[in-house]
């Protein structure tokens, strides 16, 4: 259990998602969190699990970020 959860009483769940962006890992992270926020409530933190990219004809064309998002379960 990540240390940052210790001060937040309750039960939490982890959701793993992948965000993509043509410009940066940071934009891919923001896009993933923004999309998850449309359907997941009570998100509290994220961990970057992995960063990948795509190369086409010698050029970086896509940044990919795998995130684990922690959110509190409702009662």
What is each residue range found by the language model?
Residues 1-7:
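Short, Lys/Arg-enriched N-terminal segments with co-localized hydrophobic residues
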Residues 7-8, 59:
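Short glycine/proline-enriched loop/turn "hinge" motifs that connect secondary-structure elements
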Residues 9-45:
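Short, well-ordered alpha-helical segments
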Residues 41-55:
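Charge-dense, low-complexity polyampholytic segments
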Residues 51-75:
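A cross-kingdom feature marking charged/low-complexity
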